[in-house]
Regions:
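Short beta-strand element of the alpha/beta-hydrolase
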Residues: 86-94
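The serine-hydrolase catalytic nucleophile loop
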Residues: 95-108, 268
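Alpha/beta-hydrolase active-site loop
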Residues: 134-158
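Alpha/beta-hydrolase fold nucleophile elbow
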Residues: 159-173
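Serine-hydrolase catalytic core
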Residues: 67, 75-78, 225-322
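An N-terminal hydrophobic leader/cap segment in hydrolases
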Residues: 10-67
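Hydrolase active-site cap/lid region
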Residues: 181-235, 267
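Conserved alpha/beta-hydrolase
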Residues: 110-129
Length: 323
């Protein structure tokens, strides 16, 4: 009996340091993966309003605006003013992109509808962002509600409110999570065009890790999910599923889009169509080729077709005729 106890103690002394080392290594790797993916590689603007304005009179009217987020951080975006009392639409880009990726859509949407259009850089994105990290749709949802408040405070030259009562949001990938979450907080968000919607923030970060670190992608993505708990323990990382959030959005107009170019989000977007309440006005097109996820690399014809689908949706859903 004494020999058995001594043997157990010896094994414990031998294995305990190994176990501790493994736990520390896993924790360190998990937090490192989250830290790296939460700081996106900076992407230069594809085009700026100054350059775009040389080709488009409407594009020349884009202004660079700043406002304050709910947490006191600074936000920025390009703004195209529409007609007085017309709806406004916010365009939210995907992870790793920036506001220039939605500039062309924003200008065409404004031209076709005379809606006010806001194209923000989501936190951690764009050139020299004031907040250098992303929370994969969590803080970004609060930022979107701050953007809505910014729109509400816009005035005409005569000091009347510029934007009408209804708001629409276009969200791509990470932007779609922010859009859904913001809509749950603000009933004035009447229309949502959502493309390549992740199941939740965990699946968003898993996809990002697999893309940036494809070696052992299944293992690294699981490590990253573990790392979100200590890394964002005081942050606004949200773990609710897009389906659970969608269940609260009664009476909204929704356009769901996805495609084969982003299969990791095609299935989750298709399943999301079953989550909205029965009184939602829902349209789903999940077999696009390509979806908005890679539309930036598509031909001019395909790009125009995609943009027109989004424009037609908002024009019908928000009910404001072009002026």
């Amino acid at each position: 009996m004494a020999k058995s106890i001594r043997l157990i103690k010896s094994l414990t002394r031998l294995l305990l340091p190994v176990v501790v080392l493994l736990v520390v290594a896993v924790a360190g790797a998990s937090i490192w993966l989250v830290h790296e993916t939460a700081h996106p590689v900076s992407a230069a603007y594809l085009v700026t309003p100054e350059v775009y304005g040389m080709l488009s009179a409407r594009g020349a009217q884009v202004t660079d605006e700043k406002w304050v987020n709910k947490d006191g951080t600074s936000a920025r975006g390009w703004l195209l003013r529409g007609s007085q009392d017309a709806p406004a639409v916010i365009l939210l880009h995907k992870y790793g992109a920036n506001r220039s990726y939605v500039l062309n859509l924003g200008v065409k949407l404004n031209e076709a509808t005379n809606f006010t259009v806001l194209m923000p850089d989501q936190r951690g994105h764009g050139q020299n962002p004031s907040v250098d990290y992303t929370s994969f749709g969590g803080c970004e949802a609060d930022d979107t509600t701050a953007a809505i408040e910014f729109l509400r405070n816009l005035k005409t030259p005569e000091q009347f409110s510029l934007v009408g009562k209804d708001i629409g949001i276009y969200g791509l990938e990470m932007g779609s999570l922010a859009a859904i979450a913001a809509a749950t907080k603000d009933p004035s968000v009447k229309a949502l065009a959502l493309d390549s919607v992740p199941q939740n923030a965990d699946s968003m970060i898993a996809s990002t890790v697999e893309s940036r670190y494809p070696f052992g992608s299944v293992v690294t993505s699981e490590f990253a999910k573990l790392g979100t708990r200590p890394y964002f323990y005081q942050g606004c990382y949200r773990r609710e599923s897009s389906c659970d959030m969608a269940k609260t959005l009664a009476g909204r107009s929704v356009l769901l889009m996805a495609g084969l170019d982003a299969p990791q989000f095609q299935d989750s977007t298709s399943k999301l169509s079953k989550c909205f309440p029965s009184n939602s006005m829902l349209e789903a097109k999940t077999d696009l080729s390509p979806s908005g996820y890679s539309i930036i690399n598509a031909s001019l014809e395909l790009s125009e077709s995609y943009d027109q689908r989004v424009i037609d949706f908002f024009r019908l859903a928000l009910g404001q005729p072009a002026i």
